């Protein structure tokens, strides 16, 4: 049995290893929850044996040493971290400790904030001008990232307003919105660059670039949450008051900051934020709860590495560790072959996860994944679980290599990978049952032809029994044939036939989307329909003409052109029309004849709208003569920004494009 000294040494060594990977290499190997567990275990042992605490124990400091590639900045006021609580009982115990230590009848109010999952930074302003910025580093010394921070548009280079202190050190979090993270990884996959595991790693990697020009291209943003140095001026005597003052001076502060009058209100805030978490547009891993009164903060003071007046109330972990039992390969509607990890089931963020996507062969190679490996699984909101990284330090001896198939696992056709593309595809086309099933499921889906009651299991049976080969065959189905399927009685069968009949009346845009042309999503389908107006015009369009449609480049134009050039596709379309699929004749809109503030303008919608759906907004804008595009470019005239707008808003601001909010859009639509 190990001695206490041996246990302490092993825990400290393990924690230092993971601190180095997290803070210095920006390549964490274990989830935050596992690190927290190890730290709690060490702290509990040291509490029982205080005589064995060493000055260099991970419990006695904040982070890790800075990179040698950057010059260093010493923090005049140490940047401490926060203690954590993980459940209501622990928070209520913290609340009681605060009340007991204050020993007065004076009421305690709490300033509650989001715990952003980014990189903590310190920004020093002298006479209102940004002069330096640093990472937290080890809490006393950080890396000089001034040049990089100056590229972040959310951070003012000069404060504005009155009574700005002579020296003011603002502390906050640099982070990457989810839309920006997805765009960075999408670009990286296309160009063969580094793919980041999560937005926090992407933010850290972006901020710690030696070349600020690279940082400038990344849509980083910032919220401030505190103050370090304060000289030659005064600030309000409450934490919330200080944040509101920062906002007046031009510093970004989260609009989710809330003042709570009691522990019960704090818990309500925690649960509300947890509920809203999937729609925020950026990653958080909990809430931060601070005593609002500065006088009470001073009275409570600090322990070695954290304040007694604040705590981080963390959400259930979105990352967990488990083992890869096997890797299987699925075939999608376009023939894309996707490797899927079959996992030892594990609960992640309240959901039992047994599968995780591995995307493609490049991703498997990047991860260095082998069957049998211990891996970190991440699940955020409704996102499909994914493997974040392999825990190489705990790799079993009997792992096996993942072998990518050379033939389709469903139909046996050759698998090909086009040069420059990450995805491998089955060449079987509609002779491949998997592709046929997925194509039909897409065709009947809600945003495509919207065939009510035609679920995945019905499609599976229709293909397996060879009742249906193409989308046109769906409209030839009879109630009698459908009753031959499992769990399909006469009434249900007739309902499906009625739904198919109803689905024949559609729109040109929905029809195009339902066809499943590669790279043609809803927005592109709507753009093609609006630009060409008729199926005949679209079928006859050249690649050059197709590229005149907003957001259609050479790749998408080629896919569309090739689709209509294929005789079998044209035959299916002819059959669909013969079965009665139709849509209204196009209304030709001449933007010059429309008296509208949107007429002739290229408009981009970003963020979520609260008063109307995006589809309704797009339709209304098109009616008023606008061209609705899916991405921001120099050709964009106007951006409409809803809640949680991300990288599109940032790019619009960078290009100096006019931006309005939903309220102004509704006003203009009404005018």
Curated annotation (Swiss-Prot):
Q: List the cofactors.
A: Mg(2+); Mn(2+)
Q: Which Pfam families match?
A: BRCT, DNA_ligase_aden, DNA_ligase_OB, DNA_ligase_ZBD, HHH_2, HHH_5, Nlig-Ia
GO BP terms: namely: DNA repair; DNA replication
Q: Which residues cross the membrane?
A: none
Please tell me one Gene Ontology term that the record gives under cellular component.
cytosol
Entries under InterPro entries matching the protein: BRCT_dom, BRCT_dom_sf, DisA/LigA_HHH, DNA_ligase, DNA_ligase_AS, DNA_ligase_CS, DNAligase_adenylation, DNAligase_N
Catalyses which reaction(s): NAD(+) + (deoxyribonucleotide)n-3'-hydroxyl + 5'-phospho-(deoxyribonucleotide)m = (deoxyribonucleotide)n+m + AMP + beta-nicotinamide D-nucleotide
Q: Which segments constitute the BRCT domain?
A: 593-671
Please tell me where Zn(2+) binds in this chain: 408, 411, 426, 432
- UniProt function note: DNA ligase that catalyzes the formation of phosphodiester linkages between 5'-phosphoryl and 3'-hydroxyl groups in double-stranded DNA using NAD as a coenzyme and as the energy source for the reaction. It is essential for DNA replication and repair of damaged DNA.
What name appears for this protein in its UniProt entry? DNA ligase
The species is Escherichia coli O6:K15:H31 (strain 536 / UPEC)
